């Protein structure tokens, strides 16, 4: 399909072309298509910029008529020039609330359906700003406000520099009528309230440019964090011996490096839901040792929790009977 050379669609195409050149030089991609403006504009651009683009449409089956919406989105993808379009029905179950469960089901379906292709997601600069703001509100360290990466294999995000208004305008230029998901305007979801209440207020009070500033902040922190991660990886190779950490040797490292080493080590040992409070408590075993007891870090088994202990100058991870808590 030939696309009109209008400003918005050209901006989207440029972003997709740049992403493919950087991350998918063979030109084969999958696109996650919901039928909304962001993913529609992305699909239209990918269909002409990629060597081969396939559309994956996840039907969460949470609303009446969702199958018709999914089928319509798939048909539109074929019209736009995608090599194929597949509807992936999912069951949304699990803990953490509807948003989290739907996200998990969606990503699992996309991963199963993509084959060997990277999956392009329609996250925009506005989504990036919301993500950074959410991370900031949690106060769990610099990593939480990095925002989303342009490529976190297999997930690609070509539109992180494109405003949501541009994708909507691109759909208008293409004569496409995006599907409006009721969940995207429901105040029951924190991200929706950020989008419709908090960010507009910040833009008004601070005189505009807030979304772009938040996105740039996340990008800068992500770049700086990558350097610290590399330093921490070198340090980890030196201080971890037979699965245990030499506390005195790690204590010589700067605090951000120490915590990165500990985070990597704990995750490799099976820690789950690791938060800033837990990480700092483990860091205290290294840098502020005064004979304190073990630190629970999340994870383990139904009968035993995962804990970190310091013994004879080394940190080790073990299990502790939950019934003794």
Curated annotation (Swiss-Prot):
SUPFAM superfamilies: Adenine nucleotide alpha hydrolases-like, MesJ substrate recognition domain-like. Its main location: cytoplasm. One of its GO terms (biological process) is tRNA modification. Transmembrane segments: none annotated. One of its GO terms (cellular component) is cytoplasm. Keywords: ATP-binding, Cytoplasm, Ligase, Nucleotide-binding, tRNA processing. Signal peptide: none annotated. InterPro entries: Rossmann-like_a/b/a_fold, TilS/TtcA_N, tRNA_Ile_lys_synt, tRNA_Ile_lys_synt_N, tRNA_Ile_lys_synt_subst-bd. It catalyses: cytidine(34) in tRNA(Ile2) + L-lysine + ATP = lysidine(34) in tRNA(Ile2) + AMP + diphosphate + H(+). It is an enzyme of class 6 (ligase). CDD domains: TilS_N (cd01992). GO terms for molecular function: ATP binding; tRNA(Ile)-lysidine synthase activity. It holds the Pfam family ATP_bind_3. It is found in: Cytoplasm. Its EC number is 6.3.4.19. ATP binds at residues 34-39. The N-terminal region contains the highly conserved SGGXDS motif, predicted to be a P-loop motif involved in ATP binding. Ligates lysine onto the cytidine present at position 34 of the AUA codon-specific tRNA(Ile) that contains the anticodon CAU, in an ATP-dependent manner. Cytidine is converted to lysidine, thus changing the amino acid specificity of the tRNA from methionine to isoleucine. Belongs to the tRNA(Ile)-lysidine synthase family. This is tRNA(Ile)-lysidine synthase. The gene is tilS.
């Amino acid at each position: 399909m030939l696309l009109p050379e209008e400003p918005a669609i050209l901006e989207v195409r440029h972003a997709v072309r740049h992403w493919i050149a950087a991350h998918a030089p063979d030109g084969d991609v999958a696109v996650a298509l919901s039928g909304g403006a962001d993913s529609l504009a992305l699909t239209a651009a990918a269909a002409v910029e990629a060597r081969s683009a396939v559309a994956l449409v996840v039907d969460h089956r949470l609303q009446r008529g969702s199958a018709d919406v999914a089928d319509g989105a798939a048909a539109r993808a074929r019209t736009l020039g995608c090599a194929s379009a597949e509807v992936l029905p999912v069951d949304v179950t699990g803990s953490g609330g509807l948003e989290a469960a739907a996200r998990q089901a969606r990503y699992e379906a996309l991963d199963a359906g993509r084959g060997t292709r990277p999956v392009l997601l329609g996250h925009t600069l506005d989504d990036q700003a919301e993500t950074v703001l959410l991370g900031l509100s949690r106060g769990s360290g610099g990593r939480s406000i990095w925002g989303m990466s342009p490529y976190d294999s297999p997930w690609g995000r070509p539109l992180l520099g494109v405003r949501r208004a541009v994708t909507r305008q691109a759909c208008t230029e293409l004569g496409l009528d995006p599907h409006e998901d009721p969940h995207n305007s429901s105040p029951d979801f924190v991200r929706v309230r950020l989008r419709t209440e908090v960010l507009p207020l910040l833009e008004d009070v601070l005189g505009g440019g807030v979304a772009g500033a938040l996105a740039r902040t996340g990008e800068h922190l992500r770049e700086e964090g990558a350097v610290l991660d590399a330093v921490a990886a070198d340090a980890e190779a030196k201080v971890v011996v037979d699965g245990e950490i030499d506390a005195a040797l790690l204590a010589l490292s700067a605090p951000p490096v120490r915590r990165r080493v500990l985070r990597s080590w704990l995750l490799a040992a099976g820690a789950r839901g690791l938060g800033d409070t837990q990480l700092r408590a483990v860091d205290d075993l290294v840098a502020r040792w005064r004979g304190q007891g073990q630190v629970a870090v999340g994870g383990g088994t139904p009968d035993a929790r995962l804990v970190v202990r310091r013994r004879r100058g080394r940190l080790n991870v073990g299990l502790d009977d939950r019934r003794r808590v």
